[in-house]
Amino acid sequence: MRIELAQIRPFLGDVERNFLKHREIVETSDADCVVFPELSLTGYVLKDLTFELFRYSEKAVEKLAEASRGKCVVAGTIKEVRPGVLRNSAAVIINGEVDYVYKFYLPTYGLFEERRYFQRGDPSRDLKTFQHAGIKFGVMICEDAWHPEPAEALALMGADLILIPAASPMRRLGRSLAIQDSWEALLKAHALMNAVWVTFVNTVGSQEEEFFWGGSMAVSPLGEVKLRLKLFEEDRAVYSIDLEELRRARFFSSFRDHISSFHRVLAEL
């Protein structure tokens, strides 16, 4: 399976222009699957525009499905799950059919105020895997990657690959550790602990007063960065899933030795 990381700068609030950019990339890609960032069809810093744009973004997903021509496409969008209830979503398009993955952890610190606009997904119903080009994969959106449970659950559901659409802005954690260093450490940890390929696709460019740094990357199940996109500018690149590397990683991994009672303890704390 060949995967294209499409690190784009969305036009904030301009769904039609964003759709045209998505369509051009999908139509010119020679990959089996094209992955875009979080909320790539709308832009991230939407605030109250969220309630105006969801109808347009749902129509854009339908048009993108028509243009996908047998490819797998993962695009960031807004989904109305019932009247007036919106979710930060990834549209997963396979052979023209659309399904959705919903964000579980909605950040409310710093610049983030997602709970004001979105309802979180329900893991008991919304956690799912997909199959394409011989690979089983799952999707988790940005903040979900900062918690261990979604990746662990997807791996135990049989995922070979975890895709992470994100909208991560520039910030520093402490005096010297930049956010991109934190993300790289996090992605390597998910890959190593769960013996999966991990693909992170970040937004790039400015939206309102925020600047998104890009730096998308693909990490092997052995914790090696196999592909790294540019910082601070749009970029796109393709890599191939190495199934032999996946087999080697799983031979030396204990990720299936899952002790469910840990989660019962956590639920009671």
Task: Give the label of every model feature segment.
Residues 1-5:
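Extreme N-terminal starter segment of soluble prokaryotic enzymes
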Residues 7-13:
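Short polar catalytic/cofactor-binding loops
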Residues 20-31, 149-158:
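Short amphipathic alpha-helices and their capping/turn segments at secondary-structure boundaries
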Residues 23-94, 99-104, 168-188, 192-196:
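Cys-nucleophile CN-hydrolase/nitrilase-fold catalytic domain and related Cys-dependent amidase chemistry
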Residues 57-75, 146-234:
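CN hydrolase (nitrilase-like) catalytic-core segments centered on the catalytic cysteine
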Residues 57-59, 81-161, 165, 170-185, ...:
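Active-site catalytic loop in hydrolytic enzyme cores
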Residues 75-77, 88-95, 128-130, 201, ...:
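Short beta-strand scaffold segments in enzyme catalytic cores
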Residues 245-269:
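A conserved C-terminal secondary-structure "cap"
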